[in-house]
Amino acid sequence: MKQGLQLRLSQQLAMTPQLQQAIRLLQLSTLELQQELQQALESNPLLEQIDTHEEIDTRETQDSETLDTADALEQKEMPEELPLDASWDTIYTAGTPSGTSGDYIDDELPVYQGETTQTLQDYLMWQVELTPFSDTDRAIATSIVDAVDETGYLTVPLEDILESIGDEEIDIDEVEAVLKRIQRFDPVGVAAKDLRDCLLIQLSQFDKTTPWLEEARLIISDHLDLLANHDFRTLMRVTRLKEDVLKEAVNLIQSLDPRPGQSIQTGEPEYVIPDVLVRKHNGHWTVELNSDSIPRLQINQHYASMCNNARNDGDSQFIRSNLQDAKWLIKSLESRNDTLLRVSRCIVEQQQAFFEQGEEYMKPMVLADIAQAVEMHESTISRVTTQKYLHSPRGIFELKYFFSSHVNTEGGGEASSTAIRALVKKLIAAENPAKPLSDSKLTSLLSEQGIMVARRTVAKYRESLSIPPSNQRKQLV
């Protein structure tokens, strides 16, 4: 065996901490970014937040091209030094059209959030505490509430509840009596044993003079399976009800809630703050960043000026390190916002027909289309469109919403899956309720409009819209 030395030249991309920070900030949602910046403000004394209600002195800044995130991901290093007076204003105005302040309609932007985090069990137990139960009945009520699932149904037999209490002096009749009291709690119908029981409990709360009440009770008690199958012909025959009477009774039943527990929201609150604002001005669609969604940062000049006057090397190093971290963070935010604005403008430009006329006019578009237009990598587009939201006159949409697959048309063109879903929804909305359109018929109608799509694809689109099949949509006219 012969030993020797060999020289080999190769190139390798090094992921510096600064590049990692730029990538991480790019994929954060607005809420996550706010939390990240708040942590930075608390840990880095060289960073400070600009009070948007105070006048900010204009500072001279060095002229330089904005570094977009795509370049940042491809370069091995970012510049070693940044201007000492780098502030949020010098960064943010580059991405906001002149003459606009980032304010929206009435200076207010909607913040969408979920409902209360209170669980159904919490809500029921609150009512138990307010109800004049004896100690024994309260123990029974607690066991019953524990056996209720999130949809509001009882999940175990009463015999099991009785056994779990472990009191030989309590009998099944007493458990049944407490159950009936709980079933009158809000939401009405909770703790029902099955669907039939749930609906009948809700009907029992109606005034006895309510029209069609007895007919509705008859259908639920004896013919719920026929109603579930929309077999109205057989239902009219076995109940001997005329069509108009049956229709009214069915309408009353449909006003009931088959899952009463779900009216109590149990999920964590979800907030959506728009990152991008889109509006039409003088006949043109304008795109700007939401300047109110992210804290505005700048270098703390007082602490920065102490860098060269520190008492010892340790203090000097601490200030220099935090100063550089602050500069990198501001630069990374500049990169993030520039990328977000460029991509958003490109999306709006490509999908102008959607903003003008709605979902039916959505163009097929994939990540590669935008990546090519803005000269960035697809992975960058994916990061910047995930959990980023756009506010427009048509509503709030995640940027990823505007990307969809294509379907060939008869004329050799393409239609987006989003547009086809909108057409399916429109066709179903206009159908005869007594003779709803089957998936095959929908496929045929789309074909007449030049859109060639398989029946199973239509079924998939219909299901994605939470629209039941035709046999379940059938109604009495």
Swiss-Prot record:
One of its GO terms (biological process) is nitrate assimilation. Keywords: Arginine metabolism, DNA-binding, DNA-directed RNA polymerase, Nucleotidyltransferase, Sigma factor, Transcription, Transcription regulation, Transferase. Residues 50-62 have a biased composition (Basic and acidic residues). It comes from the Bacteria. Residues 45-67 are annotated as: Disordered. One of its GO terms (cellular component) is cytosolic DNA-directed RNA polymerase complex. Pfam families: Sigma54_AID, Sigma54_CBD, Sigma54_DBD. InterPro entries: RNA_pol_sigma_54, RNA_pol_sigma_54_core-bd, RNA_pol_sigma_54_DNA-bd, RpoN_core-bd_sf. Residues 366-385 bind DNA. A motif (RPON box) lies at residues 454-462. GO terms for molecular function: DNA-binding transcription activator activity; nucleotidyltransferase activity; sigma factor activity; transcription cis-regulatory region binding. The keyword Transferase applies. Sigma factors are initiation factors that promote the attachment of RNA polymerase to specific initiation sites and are then released. This sigma factor is responsible for the expression of enzymes involved in arginine catabolism. The open complex (sigma-54 and core RNA polymerase) serves as the receptor for the receipt of the melting signal from the remotely bound activator protein GlnG(NtrC). Belongs to the sigma-54 factor family. This is RNA polymerase sigma-54 factor. The gene is rpoN.
